[in-house]
Amino acid sequence: MRAIAINDYGTPATLTELPKPEPGPGEVLVRVRASSINGFDAAVAAGMLKGMMEHRFPVVLGKDFAGTVEAVGEGASRFVAGDAVFGVVMKPFLGDGGLGEYLVVGEQHGIARIPEGLDLQAAGALGLAGTAAVNAIDAVAPTTGEDVLISGATGGVGAIALQYAVAAGAEVIATARPGAEADFVHGLGAAHVVDYTSDLAAQVRAIAPEGVPAIVHLAGEAEQLAGLLAAGGRIASTLGFGPDQHPAAVAVMADPNPVTLDRLAADAASGALRVPITRTYPLEGTPQALADFTAGSLGKLAITV
């Protein structure tokens, strides 16, 4: 099978021919049709997870996947061949990924069916970013009329979190540079845009003099953001900023359980959630997609497998 893999720590991600995997007990074999680029993938490709997770080289990149079940292993019963599925690769080691034509995953976690109305490309860009966004918004639990500051609103997680905050009735203050970034977040429903390259605190205080009740920290300096909280406010961070650093902080780890994946898929299928794909690349274009992601990109960069 064709796959995008690295052969050692920090070596370039290249298109490689690898054996087709076989499902073991409780596993399903997915013919992958779509994936996307996440910060995790870029970190793995750069060798940044050396010593943090076991690497089984060649390491196929890609946390996200969407495709069709081709076969099931012994004892697997949630899915049958032909089911359209999507999800997040959740294994205790790095080696198997969604940026290959075939993928074996456990059937109990990190995988769900794709409903009618959701195409494979969108599903392939939804899993990890969508899960992180839902978990972060659930952690701060915005209510109608509340100001919510989303720092990192222009990325994949931020663009989805922004939409869920708006759906909850919140007034979203989104960080974005003037121009294309500001237009992007306004298009997703942001009520206010603050330029993170300027005096962020002054801009936020001009909108919310008493501070903001809720903050989603996806980028930027967490301590500076925490200083913008209103009394009794809460901050959710996907970057490790938690209660050890601030009593109002919750460190969020994306948990792609079937309930969350089903929620994301249903919202995307109904049109309530827009999967914010801004560019699509072929599998062999993944190295360019990684470079574009690292340089700074809007929304999600999708990969057709």
Where are these regions (language model features)?
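Glycine-rich cofactor phosphate-binding loops and adjacent beta1-alpha1 units
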Residues: D183-A251
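Rossmann-fold dehydrogenase core element
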Residues: G232-P276
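Mid-domain Rossmann-like dinucleotide-binding core that forms the NAD(H)/NADP(H) cofactor-binding site
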Residues: A123-S198
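NAD(P)H dinucleotide-binding glycine-rich loop of Rossmann-like/cofactor-binding domains
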Residues: E54, R78, V88-G152
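Glycine-rich beta-strand-centered segment in the early N-terminal region that forms part
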Residues: P19-I37, L49-K91
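Residues located in well-ordered beta-strands
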Residues: R2, T14, R31, A66-T68, ...
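C-terminal hydrophobic helical "lid"/dimerization subdomain
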Residues: M1, L261-V305
